[in-house]
Amino acid sequence: MDRFMEQVAIEASQMYVTEEGKSPFANTTIEKLPDKVLLNIFSYLSHLEICRMATICRRWRQIAYDSRLWKNVSLRPEISGLHVGSLESLMTLISARFGPSLRYLELPIELITHHVLHELAAKCPNLTHMLLDFQQAMQLHDFSELQAFPAKLRYLCICLSEVIFMEGFMRKIYNFINGLEVLHLVGTYEKTDQEEEEIYEVINVHKLKAATPNLRVINLYGINFIDDSHIDAFSSNCIQLECLAVNFCNKVTGATLKTLFQRSKRLKCLLMNGTSLQSEYVMAVEWDKTILQELDITATDLSSECLIDMLTRIPSLKFLSAGQINGFNDSVLKAWMESGNCKSLLSLDLDASDNLSDEILSKFITRYGGQLQACILSGMAHITDQLWMTILPILKSAKILVMGCHERLSVNIHVDQLMDAIATNCPKLERLELRWDPENLRFSDKSQKAIDLLRVKCLKLRCMVLSDGRYYELVKANFERADRMTVVRNTTCCRVSPYYMIQNYNDLIFN
């Protein structure tokens, strides 16, 4: 009804006429807007849409080509939809459209040549962030004549190929990247065939670390040749290191962790998801002497003894991601509570921790839930809506919640009550994911009221992820009627992560 009345009001305003029989808005079109306002409107569009706007008229073409709209540019077709047909066209774009305004640039392999890099160095003095994608490369261009490279880079992301050796290129740029603060080396973890045996060290990390002494954030993601010696190499030269991520580097065992913390006194964030950590190496670290605040040890094989030893000695942990670990059981969580080291905890991820009981989780949340901003208790069949209904009144500060498991349960989840409890108790909620099988979700004809309450009470909610099914369609339609088109998403294409809580999250974003 409200939607209908809004439509009537809009149509009435459009039909309004004066005594002369003409609407006062008849001559009000977008053409009347000044260039400054149009430029601001265009800034909300993607570059692909801006290029389409340039075909409308000469004035819009002039605005679309304003360099202020081209500060952050991706020329990777699979990411932005933009494709530059030739190197000559790109050279023209760099000088005519990008120029001093360009801050961030992504280049695919076919556009990474010494001519392009020379032009960027000469015409784009304010370029500070760059991504170079070599993943699809079968052969590099000739860089023997490369004499210049953007020298003000603070952020560099290199997507590595499995078979192309980078040393010929890297050797030419070492003198230009000593100001780097953030380095991403992205491997081919998601594309690698597990049966392949040959592994090539396609980039020389030991030489790279000597050229980048000012690194604060290092992200080595899914690189199959990265091991503990490479971590040791970076720690020997990067004394300002604050964040180290080696997620899905399965050759990392933790053998150099003790040395890492002894050298890197500023290290606050350590992300080691999917690595091959060994308990004896982890227990050798002097955790009580570190200033570590953020730790990810998801999907590692650490023992219960090791987990107790580590967690009870880290003095001020704010972020813990420790899902999919068989050793994380009731005794670990109990010992951690008794140590008193949970007082600073803001984010807890215990996804798929099947050896934790309802009782110990309830005790932990009762004591520390009021301070938690992210709580991930998903992937456990025994954690149902009953436990969540008990702990939600405590999670007053929650910004991120993930609950439910994909496997079919023998019990049903009363989702209307759950939505009502979330809306009532979590006004700061920004991200929510329900992973339960849609066949387990039970809702009534009054579900719209519970969804309305969630939408109205949780005004900061920007992402809600549900499994595909009737309830997903119901919630999606509700939010779309309220013009919140992008909030409700499907588990097949979106997952909620607690990584938003990490202090250096913006620096860790890549690809």
Q: Model segments located where?
A:
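N-terminal adaptor-interaction module of cullin-RING ubiquitin ligase components
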Residues: 1-221, 227-235, 243, 248, ...
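C-terminal capping region of solenoid repeat domains
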Residues: 1-18, 24, 82, 89-91, ...
